[in-house]
Amino acid sequence: MSDTSQTEAPVSNDAADHDRHDVLVVGGGVAGLSAATFTARAGLDTVVVDDGNSIVKRNAHLENVPGFPAGVNSRLFCEMQREQARRSGSAFVDGRVTDLRRVDGGGFRAGVDGDVDTDSGLYATYVVAASWSDTSYLDGLGVDLRVAGSKTYIGDDGLGRTSVEGLYAAGRLTERYHQAVVAAGHGAQTAITLVHDSETPFYNDWVTPEGYFTDRGREVPPGCEEIDEAERRRREAESLETMQAFFAESHPEPQRTHPSLVDDE
């Protein structure tokens, strides 16, 4: 990890007019939404800043994501993943993080489409950077970066932690393989690392049948849930209804291509 940005002084923690969250996820692509789903389900107040430009939307048809035997429209896949994160408890802010600073006493303040000192600022204890391929907002944090030609990657410890305490990174931004399923898995891994570091009680994110733990004389571990048969059937019915609604007709959003091929005029 060769290129370390210069560190700027922390900003004031006078955030009375700023939104406060446990976790800020920068980027609403596959890795970011996967991370947000896990942190929100673990009970951490999570907000995702998303400019709507996930690179996965350039795919004509996603054909290697588990669970879709005939593939899935990439724009629909993004919509479904966003809805899953929302149902899990994540909030969303449309826009782009343009500035990120450490805060006196811990945590971070982020500027959305503006400086951190504007009313658009967000405060979070933890940040997950999942904004492939933008790292410009990290310039003042002194995080370890690796420049490879036109690409810049964030160094991590293998589990999503960066060289800056409280800052995590997920997906292609950490030089993981450029595949949707890899990004989803790494987003989940990074989120679980963050949850453990936050000291939030957590064992696994499991929904189990009634008695799975308690009938063996065990308490239900943190992060897990036992549900009875009636609740299982209710959730299954809801999932069928939700999926049928998503797949009722073709997705209306037009196919995207590489930005260099788009005529801006």
Residues covered by each model-derived region:
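FAD-site-proximal beta/loop scaffold in flavoenzymes
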Residues: 5-11, 20, 41, 134-177
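Beta1-alpha1 glycine-rich phosphate/pyrophosphate-binding loop at the start
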Residues: 21-76
